[in-house]
Amino acid sequence: MTDSRRQGELSLQRSFTQVGAALAALGILPGLLASGLLSGCVRDALTCGEGFSKCALVCADLTSDAANCGGCGVACKAGELCQNGRCRCPPDATLCGNACVVTASDPANCGGCAGTGGGQACLTNQVCELGQCQTSCVSPRSTQCGRSCVNLASDVNNCGACDHPCRDAQSCHSGRCTHDIVAACFNTGQVVGIQGETDLQSTRARVGSFPQALGSLDDVLLVADGIDQRLRQARLDDFSPLPGDVRLGASPNHIWVDDPLIYVVNSLGNTLQILQRQTSPANGGLQLSTIGEVNFGPVSSPQAIAFIGTVAYIPFWSGPAQVVRVDVADPRAPAVTRVFDLRDLDLHPFDGALTYARPGAVAVAWGKIYVALQNLDPRFAPGGPGMLAKIDPVSESVTAINLGADVCLNAFWLSAADDALYVSCAGKIIYGPGYQPLAVDKSGVVVLNEREERVSTWNVACAPGSAGCIPPSVGRFAIFNHRLYLGDQAGGRVFVVETLADHQLIERRGHNPVNGGPPLLACPRDTGMLSLVIDVIAVP
């Protein structure tokens, strides 16, 4: 490394130390975040936040509140849910007359609406199972609830017990009502649930002040509050708050759950914090306590964590570009055992550019460690193509992977699934007055196979000629049932991309969808300001 590059790096370290804002270590628009120009400052309890309307004594989300659907006091009928401000039947139900019924198990409309709908009304001594009238339930997974045969492990109307319906956009996971995907809105302090495949959204709920990272354990949602520095708890079914907050370090950026342990990477606190739960979740929530910690030193800015066995790998975004290996075999005494230096990697800088690796996300695939390199210049703009660093845990070699400037700038998040490595690229964002995004270049997803070949790409963009569309920039994402749910760092959206058997990518919810619809508006947005979907997780 040249002396000028080292001096430039030291200068950047000093500038980040002077910033002093909790979000400077996120790696997302550091100057913008530090300036506080994002929308949705938390307001006092008497005022409804962004995305909510005051209806009598409550703040209601008119887009998804079944009691205030599209307007205050507009209530949906029993069995209906509210989506985009309209009452409708759930995906597994059919409108028969004026009621939403599940024709697979409804004895009055078995197999379809009775009469002209192709179904039939079962006799009083019969039950309805899989759309057929029978004398009894025959499937080994079926339980008789009244005259309906249902699977208590997955039936949203009888989840875990007869007549125990799941609400809104929830699914039934192993007899427990929950959401398939949860997204966090940093600006407004809210979380929102999404039902996989149907892409239905729940009512947004306030959890803390500025949720920065999410995790889940049993039926509890874990929310790391980026400003209050607390690990908050909420129920996964309705996001109602639970007691048991735990103090975290500054700017908690990533949560990794390995029951009974919870690992939290505190980016401005420069620590790895290890918590352990003491009890099963009850009405009082989880009892958590910190049992171990590693302090990495000032201006390291650890970003994320991934594991091979009891060995953790954590990238440092600030300071010298490094990845540390931490032995957590004894979580009460974690220890750094190796430091991998990334500064001498060939970052393929653009002509005349001085660029820094800025390692962020990390994932394990095919027994190797892959680290996303944002590859930014001193002004935090892309100084070269989106890159990855690969660490071989056996040989301890470190190599660089060029994702290609033709499709990827600012490699941001990554995850392994279905024998492939998926990488999101935040792109190059061009701002106008007031930090309004005017254009985003080379944001999307790159898919690599085991040979580290690019097998598929997807570019996120507004539809050609569309007016008023905020240029999207995708960041963190979750994978659920062969679908990527990608958080938008500019307009509060979630884009949905399906992965086919050959790893080809098909946009299902976006501005250019194939047999789909528009992107999900997960987080509300004030005119002229950014709205940040800061984290997205899939619930096991």
Model regions and ranges:
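Predominantly soluble domains enriched in secretory-pathway, periplasmic, or organellar proteins
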Residues: 43, 171-540
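C-terminal motif of bacterial Sec signal peptides marking the signal peptidase cleavage site
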Residues: 38-40
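Cysteine-rich modules of extracellular adhesion/ECM and protease-associated proteins
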Residues: 42-179
